[in-house]
């Protein structure tokens, strides 16, 4: 019996109730599952694939209906799913439930997720519980479909007192809880779900993006209009700029590369290695170079580092350098030997000229890395002598207040002092600048670095020297002794670090290649992937690691010996090669030494141990210290002259003193016997240069030889010092050495990292490729997160919406008109009749002074009939007196003066309330306006009928004849009316007064004494455009092309087709034809015909008696 009842209650196929839909979906799913179990899927893979696809679709359908049933039955008792906020947008799809069911069945059957075996093992019991609970729910729902189904019911009609219903309720709650738990576990295993820390980091990244956008708007890289318009280009520009700002400007923010990798955001964690290398290169950029990079990231424009003087922190080429550069480009095509001699002479003159005029010399002294200025004369100077002399000159130069770039012995090879035979673009000055100024600054003090750059344009040489000495840590003192043993040991520690850097950069055998484009010598080992083609995919190793070039000193020494042996057998070839392409190791050493000195300054100043008067930055042996102290005092008076002409000695034959020559000769003899196995490549370069010297310059050669020997002994201090001094070195504070070692290594790595690039354009272009590559990968790998961040950034930084301006309602009738009549509109053929309400005074207000003229003179001209006054009204008394005065010519002046006395001027239709406040005059004026309105309506109807009659017959109407015969001086409405009244004979039957009287006694009009109607009605309010998306007649939707039109009669909104009619609306004061809809047009036309018929009946006897009154009045 129960089975029979269920068969009878089986839902129909067209039943739309929830239970019926579930019943049929469940039956279809069962059929597909049975078919899948009926054959071997490996034998028929195509059929199996189709059935699996159908199975997934049916599962989605069954779970969707089950979810709706749970929503209605459980309501608020459903298990919360707030964890879905952690899911990416790609996961939250409509078929997510079906995927979860399919995954639960696979896990319950023993399958595992690929590469997630451990997670699959943990989820397997939960998956089995989910499938078992879902099967039980399906059975109970099928039973309810056969018991309590109401066909086509929108709600469930279940008996809650039934035990089966309560069982279904509890089963649904259990299934909902298990399915929610399995959803979180399964999705977390398939995709990475963010933790609380990751959400906080993502919010900080959003703050970084917002700060970057505001900074870009302030600097001028972006426009506010682009933000308001949601420019798609900002989707790429903002992440790129945020990477630069996060690494440099806001270095303590979410892109702080000093924090552990696991604390970084998930978005930037895969790029941590490359971001660290980008940060190191960004810190070497000046303020202008950073701006050029950011501009390149925004606009992809060409890089332009040619900045005029004083515009940025990059020092522009001085006039002397521009002249020398032009000389260089000209002389480059000639013989190199001849140009070398001329270059040395030009260098001497330039140095003399630049003594008191060079500005901003702190950065040029760090830009001594220009390898292209090493001509034949400069190649004879060893790098060790350059470094040692560069370290000894600042103290001497401090007395004469001369910029360090002039006092340096390598000043002849600086870009601003010496013309070079190789082509030198003007932007190459900054391309080889050292990172000594910025590499040691902490990221938090980047703003201080920017502020310092703003003061680079001072024209005072002394102020620049003081600023440079303060920044570089050079003390301006001549009275202090040399550093004590502790400072010497600290310097020795720095020198050991410096030795490793120079050895790694300069002593690699056979790895120096000339770069023809820039004149640099770039090591092949330093190129790495930095100079690889742009088509190479972005990896973490596309920036060469600086650790590879540093190496250890032992490996460098092992590579040094075969190089020296090879160069010893090829002296002539090496001499020519060094003459043409020698790398400026001394410049790199000088830039590195300035960085070391800046690092050493806090430690030496803390012990109140000022630097010596000659500011030695290298460590000397004890025997050399006494000699240096005595020789510094002996050469103090002429050291400035020596440093200025260091490279011009060969041409001016400046001979040193005898004592210096003897000492130099002795040192030369001693150095010839000195083994060179412990010196680095710069000493070996000196060996070859020594053999290439000429005899007349032996004294200068000896001096340089002695200088080189001092530096050689400096590097090998530990081999030449005594046992007591060795113990002093061992007593160096280990904590200070370890703390300074990190700073020194960081500074040296940053300095050498920039030397790998042949120009500033190459550096900026490589940074652009790197930063753009990281930002573009964010667009691909983290598209959902990036969209959410950018959406928030746009909403936070877009301009505030303008407040709705409340337009006050128009109170004056004159402002309700759609347009103002011009003078041409007033004097048209139809405007001269009574239908025009636009006064000529509004068009030509200069005639207001008509009433201000003398009433005693020209009285006849200002009579009521002959005046040109505009917008004036005449009452009945005035008309009567005017008509009576026309009977005799003797009383013309008195009648005209009487008429003027009764003329009341009204300024405009909207200014009636500003007229006379007298009650009697106000009532009289209202009566006159009412009569005139009735007369205008009657005349308009008659004219319309006459116009229609003329159009159909083709004859000239009396009105047209009257209008054409009227004089041009009576074109205004008032003058036409008054003139016609004045010219009518007294015996005519159709006078204006009788017409007015007739109109006043007609049924359609109002009596003279009892008129209560208003002059004009206020136009209807227009329906706003926003409330009328469709035409109110044809219901056609409005588009950009199909515009809205308002009917002036009803205020409705219509399309152009439904409102193409036009008709005058006298009841609203609109006597000219205006736009009306078709319905209003038909209604107005019917009214016009009815009024025309009544008007023709009124005037028919008058026309019979008077013949053609209009023609008579015109005559």
UniProtKB/Swiss-Prot annotation:
It comes from the Eukaryota. Residues 308-488, 545-586, 600-742, 879-1027, 1088-1115 are annotated as: Disordered. Residues 322-361, 374-417, 425-444, 558-577, 600-614, 658-676, 714-726, 733-742, 881-901, 921-975, 988-1020, 1090-1100 have a biased composition (Low complexity). GO terms for cellular component: early endosome membrane. Zn(2+) 1 binds at residues 1031, 1034, 1055, 1058. The modification Phosphoserine is found at residues 603-604, 908. The keyword Phosphoprotein applies. Gene3D superfamilies: Zinc/RING finger domain, C3HC4 (zinc finger) (3.30.40.10). The keyword Zinc-finger applies. A zinc finger (FYVE-type) spans 1025-1085. Keywords: Metal-binding, Phosphoprotein, Zinc, Zinc-finger. It holds the Pfam family FYVE. GO terms for molecular function: zinc ion binding. Disulfide bonds: none annotated. Residues 449-488 have a biased composition (Acidic residues). Zn(2+) 2 binds at residues 1047, 1050, 1077, 1080. Residues 615-628 have a biased composition (Polar residues). Residues 363-373 have a biased composition (Basic and acidic residues). InterPro entries: FYVE_LST2, LST-2, Znf_FYVE, Znf_FYVE-rel, Znf_FYVE_PHD, Znf_RING/FYVE/PHD. Residues 632-655, 677-706 have a biased composition (Basic residues). Negative regulator of epidermal growth factor receptor (EGFR) signaling. Belongs to the lst-2 family. This is Lateral signaling target protein 2 homolog. It comes from Drosophila grimshawi.
């Amino acid at each position: 019996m129960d089975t029979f009842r269920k068969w009878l209650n089986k839902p129909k196929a067209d039943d739309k109730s929830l239970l019926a839909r579930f019943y049929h979906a469940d039956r279809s799913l069962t059929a597909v599952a049975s078919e899948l179990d009926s054959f071997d899927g490996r034998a028929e893979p195509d059929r199996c694939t189709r059935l699996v696809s159908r199975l997934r679709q049916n599962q989605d359908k069954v779970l969707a209906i089950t979810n709706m049933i749970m929503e209605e039955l459980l309501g608020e008792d459903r298990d919360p799913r707030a964890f879905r906020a952690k899911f990416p947008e790609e996961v939250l799809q409509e078929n997510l439930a079906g995927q979860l069911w399919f995954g639960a069945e696979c896990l319950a059957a023993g399958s595992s997720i690929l590469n997630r075996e451990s997670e699959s093992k943990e989820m397997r019991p939960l998956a089995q519980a989910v499938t078992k609970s879902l099967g039980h729910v399906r059975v109970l729902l099928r039973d309810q479909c056969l018991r309590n189904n109401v066909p086509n019911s929108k709600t469930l009609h279940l008996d809650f007192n039934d035990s089966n219903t309560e069982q279904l309720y509890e089963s649904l709650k259990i299934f909902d809880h298990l399915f929610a738990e399995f959803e979180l576990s399964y999705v977390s295993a398939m995709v990475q779900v963010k933790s609380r820390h990751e959400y906080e980091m993502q919010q900080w990244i959003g703050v970084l993006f917002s700060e970057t956008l505001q900074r870009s708007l302030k600097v001028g890289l972006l426009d506010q209009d682009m933000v308001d318009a949601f420019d798609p280009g900002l989707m790429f520009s903002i992440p790129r700029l945020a990477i630069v700002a996060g690494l440099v400007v806001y270095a303590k923010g979410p892109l702080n590369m000093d924090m552990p990798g696991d604390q970084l955001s998930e978005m930037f964690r895969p790029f941590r290695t490359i971001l660290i290398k980008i940060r190191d290169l960004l810190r070497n950029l000046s303020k202008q170079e950073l701006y050029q990079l950011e501009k390149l990231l925004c606009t992809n424009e060409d890089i332009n580092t040619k900045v005029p003087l004083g515009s940025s922190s990059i020092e522009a080429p001085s006039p002397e350098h521009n002249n020398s550069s032009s000389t260089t480009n000209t002389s480059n095509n000639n013989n190199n030997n001849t140009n070398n001699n001329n270059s040395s002479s030009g260098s001497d003159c330039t140095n003399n000229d630049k003594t008191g005029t060079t500005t901003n010399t702190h950065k040029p002294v760090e830009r001594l890395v220009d390898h292209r200025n090493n001509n034949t004369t400069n190649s004879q100077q060893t790098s060790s002598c350059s470094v040692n002399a560069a370290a000894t000159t600042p103290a001497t130069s401090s007395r004469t207040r001369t910029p360090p770039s002039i006092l340096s012995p390598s000043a002849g090879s600086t870009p601003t002092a010496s013309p070079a035979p190789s082509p030198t673009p003007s932007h190459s000055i900054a391309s080889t600048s050292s990172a000594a100024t910025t590499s040691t600054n902490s990221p938090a003090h980047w703003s201080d670095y920017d502020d310092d750059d703003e003061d680079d344009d001072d024209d005072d040489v002394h102020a620049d020297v003081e600023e440079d000495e303060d920044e570089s840590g050079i003390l301006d003192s001549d009275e202090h002794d040399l550093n004590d043993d502790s400072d010497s040991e600290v310097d020795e520690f720095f020198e050991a670090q410096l030795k490793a850097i120079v050895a790694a950069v300069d002593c690699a055998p056979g790895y120096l290649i000339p770069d023809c484009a820039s004149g640099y010598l770039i090591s092949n080992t330093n190129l790495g992937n930095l100079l690889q083609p742009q088509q190479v995919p972005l990896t973490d190793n596309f920036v060469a690691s600086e650790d590879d070039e540093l190496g250890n000193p032992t490996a460098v020494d092992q590579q040094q010996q075969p190089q020296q042996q090879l160069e010893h057998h090829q002296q002539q070839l090496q001499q020519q090669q060094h003459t043409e392409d020698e790398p400026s190791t001394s410049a790199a050493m000088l830039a590195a030494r300035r960085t070391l000195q800046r690092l050493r300054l806090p430690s030496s100043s803390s012990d109140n141990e000022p630097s010596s008067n000659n500011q030695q930055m290298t460590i000397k042996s004890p025997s050399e210290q006494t000699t240096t102290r005595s020789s510094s005092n002996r050469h103090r008076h002429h050291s400035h002259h020596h440093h200025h002409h260091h490279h011009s000695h060969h041409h001016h034959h400046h001979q040193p003193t005898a004592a210096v020559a003897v000492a130099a000769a002795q040192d030369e003899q001693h150095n010839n016997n000195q083994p060179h196995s412990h010196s680095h490549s710069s000493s070996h370069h000196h060996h070859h240069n020594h053999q290439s010297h000429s005899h007349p310059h032996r004294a200068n050669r000896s001096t340089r030889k002695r200088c080189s020997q001092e530096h050689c002994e400096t590097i090998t201090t530990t081999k030449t010092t005594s046992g007591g001094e060795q113990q002093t070195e061992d007593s160096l504070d280990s904590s200070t050495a370890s703390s300074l070692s990190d700073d020194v290594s960081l500074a040296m790595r940053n300095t050498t990292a920039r030397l790998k690039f042949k120009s500033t354009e190459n550096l900026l272009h490589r940074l652009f490729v790197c930063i753009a590559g990281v930002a573009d990968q964010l667009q691909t790998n983290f598209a959902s997160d990036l969209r959410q961040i950018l959406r928030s950034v746009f909403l936070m930084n877009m301009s505030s919406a303008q407040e709705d301006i409340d337009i006050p309602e128009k109170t004056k009738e004159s402002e309700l008109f759609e347009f103002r009549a011009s003078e041409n509109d007033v004097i048209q053929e139809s405007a001269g009749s009574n239908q025009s309400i636009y006064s000529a005074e509004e068009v030509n207000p200069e005639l207001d002074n008509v009433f201000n003229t003398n009433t005693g003179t020209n009285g006849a001209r200002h009579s009521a009939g002959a005046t040109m006054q505009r917008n004036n009204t005449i009452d009945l008394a005035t008309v009567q007196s005017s008509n009576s005065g026309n009977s005799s010519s003797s009383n013309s002046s008195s009648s005209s003066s009487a008429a003027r006395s009764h003329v009341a001027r009204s300024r405009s239709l909207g200014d009636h309330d500003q007229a006379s406040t007298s009650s009697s005059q106000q009532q009289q004026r209202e009566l006159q306006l009412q009569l005139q309105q009735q007369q205008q309506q009657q005349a308009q109807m008659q004219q319309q009928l006459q116009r229609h009659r003329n159009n159909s017959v083709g004859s000239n109407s009396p009105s047209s004849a009257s209008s054409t015969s009227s004089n041009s001086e009576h074109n205004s409405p008032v003058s036409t009316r008054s003139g016609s009244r004045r010219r009518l004979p007294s015996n005519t039957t159709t006078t204006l007064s009788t017409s007015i009287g007739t109109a006043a006694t007609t049924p359609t009009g109002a009596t003279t004494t009892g008129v209560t109607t208003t002059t004009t009605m206020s136009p209807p309010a227009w329906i706003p455009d926003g409330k009328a998306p469709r035409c109110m007649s044809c219901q056609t939707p409005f588009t950009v092309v199909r515009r809205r039109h308002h009917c002036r009669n009803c205020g409705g909104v219509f399309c152009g087709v439904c409102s193409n009619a036009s008709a005058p609306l006298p009841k609203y004061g609109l006597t000219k034809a205006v736009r009306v809809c078709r319905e209003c047009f038909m209604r107005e036309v019917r009214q016009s015909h009815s009024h025309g018929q009544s008007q023709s009946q009124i005037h028919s006897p008058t026309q019979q008696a008077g013949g053609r009154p209009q023609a008579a009045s015109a005559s």
